[in-house]
Amino acid sequence: MKYLLFLLCFLPLQALCQDVKVIINEDFGLIYKSDTLYASLVANGDTIFISDDDVSWHLQDLLRFQNQTLKEEGIYIRYPDIIAMEIEQIATLLDYKSEVNYKNAIKNERRTITFYGPITLMLRKSHTVTIKKCTLVIENNKLIKYHCSYCQHDDVGIPTENTKFEYKYDEKDRIVKIFNKGKLEQTISYVEQQ
């Protein structure tokens, strides 16, 4: 048994489902600039801050460094903008589905929505990540943070120029359908927790 556990320690990290905590703000700007928080990010390797600049770090960096103590200068892992935008669109479909909900929202009301995959999102032209579950936290009708668990990161993806994603929300069946150029690519189920 001990020998088996020893071998498991050396399995490729990509083979395991890892949790990724993501904190965003409405304009996808950098939220925290504190050296202390960045140091925490480096030490824990489990929180990614979305940036609106052109730094293109990939989830592979998170997998590579999550169990290591990095040097003080650290590596700032940035979540690619494309995933932020994809999840933002899904959140919009789930939460802003009617004007009534928007107009009648209670000030500072916080709601949590969880959707289930697997859903494959595109990082760049040739990188994808497969998410198994994503929980959105919405406060006062704004997506304030989400927490995703992903199972796979691939170097083979769909080129950007060949994609045109459309999202269709089905309130009755509690699913979101994702189409690419009119063809159904994926179906996401979700639950809503009031």
Predicted segment positions?
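Bacterial Sec-dependent N-terminal signal peptides
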Residues: 1-20
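Buried hydrophobic residues that stabilize the cores of well-folded domains
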Residues: 18-194
